[in-house]
Each structure stands twice: as C-alpha cells, then as structure tokens.
Amino acid sequence: MQCYGQGKTRGTAAVLGIEATVNQACAALTVHSGCSKFLFYQLQNSYHAIRRLSNTGNQENLNAEIIKNFKILWPDELEQQKIAAILSTQDKVIELKEKLLAQKQQQKKYLMQQLLTGKKRLLGFDRKWNYVKANEIFKSIVDKNHDSKLEVLSSTQDKGIVPRSQVDIDIKYNENSLSTYKKVCEGDFVISLRSFQGGIEYSNYAGIVSPAYTVLRAIVKIDAGYYKQFFKSSNYIKRLNVAVYGIRDGKQISYDDFGQIKIPVPPIEEQREVAKILSTADHEIDLLQKSIEAEKQKKKALMQLLLTEKVSVKCNG
C-alpha cells in the first residue's frame, strides 16, 4: 500500500496489486498483522484529517513520521475483514455503474456522430439535407432593454446557460455594470469565451449575460433540441476551431466567425426525431450519474458507521 505525500493529492492512499518501487513522494505502508484493505479504507475515510496534519511551508507535505503517528481504530482481524468485505462490495457496485456510464456515454457519442451529420438516417426520412451558413439560421441579438432585475446567467460546459446562483464557483461581477448586460430568452444560444473548447451553449432560462457573450436566436423555424446537440458535438467543435484558428482563452469567437460555418438543416420533422433520441440518451446518462453519486454517498455513510465503531459487525467464528 502507498500513501502520496506531496501537493494537491497528498493523503491519497492506494492498495498495490503488484510488487513495485515508489518514489520519495510516496510512503510505502506494509501491514504486518491485520487486513491491508481495512487499513486502506481507514486512510481513505481519514483523508481530510491526514491532509490537515501536513507540514507547512512552500509546499505542504506529509512524511512517514506523520503517517506513522496517526491514530486509527483497529478492531480484531476478523472484524476488519468483514468491514473490508462490505466496503469492497460497495466499491464493486460503484465500479460496475461507472463502467455502464462510460458505455452509455460512448453510445451517445456514436449516435451524435451518426445522426447529427446524416451519416445514419432514421427510418422514414430520406430527403437530402441542406447545408447553409449559420448566419442564415441564427442572428446575433444585442438586447440591453431591461431593468437589470433579471437573473444573471453564466455559461457552463456541462449544463449550458444557467443562473449564476447554480454555479459552484463564486463569480464576481459589478452590479453597476448590469445595464450593459445582454438579455437572453429561453431557447436562445450563447457563444461564450470557452466555446472553442466546449461548443455553443443553450439556455433554458430567461435572464442577462455578460456583454462579452454573443446571444444567438433562430430566424427560421428549427427544433432547438437538435441544434442544442449539434453545437456540442465534437465534429462541430473541431470545425469551429478550424474557423477561429489562433483564438485562445479570454478571446471571443465573433458572430462573423460563427456565421460563416456551414451547418446542416435537416427537415424539421427529422430534427425533432433526432433530438428526441439524443435527449433520451442524455436522460439515461443523467439518471445513471445520479445513481452513482447516491452509491458513493452510501459508501461514505457505511464508512462513517463501520470505521468509527458507531455500528459493530457481527463476526461468527
């Protein structure tokens, strides 16, 4: 077993399945009597407490002496094995669900590559797709006609445009400058400062966004769900990067850059059906992610109960 002692990952423990040597940043831990997997779970459960014991200085470090003197509960070996078995079973549940999630995500990626490009057509649809410049489908909206009481929205690569109150990080802004912010309506798309990395974001909310963003609104009839998926596809992001070669963090993709890229315009009925399929895939992925998070919380609860003697494990024999 090893415990990493430096930097942001200090305090991280791992059980080695092979014979190995470790560098000076790691402490090698050998269990002379007892269950090594139980020790691993104890260290995992004590992660934050161990980190707080780090040396101070230019770089906070752990050393062998600190780890050696760290006190943990150490029941008899049979109980250790029982507890380790329970937690290992929970780990396997999480691992299996994470593998299923990876498969679902790969399936979604494949569907996007096939359905959003017309490589694979749905039954009942055979009309040729049109390809037109994006500025024939979307226009840039600069609407600052608001009273600044609308909610401030932020761009995220995983959730699209959301209220700033839902973003984990604390983003500062000057309330006196809100009059310069652009109005966004539900169903609009937004080009953010990170769109060259994560595509163009869709807004399910009405609000206002930074003047650094470009707000896009359809000027012809479309299914927003189709373009919500299309603008996040790896194929489109690659094309966007080619069109704006040289742009780096902090620089905006202009509407003119966006508008010159040709995008597909399938029949509206086909747009809807493709969007439904991909939305269903998203829903399945979301449910599985929530299930995995619930299993991780269950494991944390088990560790708190079993590794602190709040609940004892019955041992026969």
Kindly give the residue locations of the regions a language model identified:
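A short glycine-rich beta-alpha junction/loop motif
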Residues: 20-27, 43, 55-78, 194, ...
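A short beta-sheet element
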Residues: 1-44, 180-236, 254
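Hydrophobic structural patches
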Residues: 83-94, 122, 274-285
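Sequence-specific dsDNA recognition surfaces
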Residues: 17, 21-22, 28, 135-186
